[in-house]
């Protein structure tokens, strides 16, 4: 289900340089705070952006293990959404939709407008699962 046009990793040089610099700094934070789920999830997003799929998945999954929603509904819900973004960015639509379907149920989950408009979710546009999640959040007509 992966398509080069819908995954990250083939970034223009200036953007790749920015992601690489961000990765260096974020990796320092993870080394200082190895049990910080948020820091690890952000590192996973950066790695997804750089096309480092295995690292991104490992970091995102580890972050969700460190901060499950049954331990912290707000921040754990946010970590689930980060894992969904990682899935979207590496072309794993199943992972992205599975996690996003869970993440939208929490207060920190993305809104209808965010899913509809933010480019973060562009890799999933047109995927029936994603479109179903978006439609489920649509406001009721007056």
Q: Where would I find each of the regions flagged by the language model?
A:
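Alpha-helical protein-protein interaction modules
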Residues: 1-142
